[in-house]
Amino acid sequence: SDAKQFGLCTMVSQDDAGLVIWPTHRLIDAGDIGETSAIKKIGKAMTMTEVTEEEMESRLKEHLFGMMFRSGRCFLLDNTSDDGNVMMRLDTYAAQQKILYGVYKSDEGKSKISYDAELGSVKKAMAEKKHDAAIVLNAPCLQTIWDLAGQGKRMPKKTTFFFPKIWSGWVFYRME
């Protein structure tokens, strides 16, 4: 139908001082993949440094991303190499390929991934042991987003969480 030819969007200038981009962290329900096994497999794919939760948060920007496990163990992670793949420099892509698909097999339905843009909420969920693991990401740089888009690259879903947002129901326009 004609109505399906259109999509609603919000346009915000990249130079707008109010533009904020948050990361969207990944929460993992691992199915039958145990923590010890996961850590061992991740350690083969990436460089892992065990840290406290506070250190993970304070030093996160110096690393590709962080991970928290149900046991309370926390790590900072980096690629051992990007094999010439520019996408592996993007934390969400490396996490998706090496951990979510590579270890937890979420692309095969062997684990469930949920998303949360608020670090405080992620930390609370992990403290309450609601998930097996969490991938804590850095806020994406706007220039990285533009560079990858300019190369025709697609970032993993929920790589970014942009503000400002239009309130749901705030704008009504009958599309017929």
Each model region followed by its residue ranges:
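Surface-exposed, charge/polar-rich loops and edge strands
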Residues: 1-176
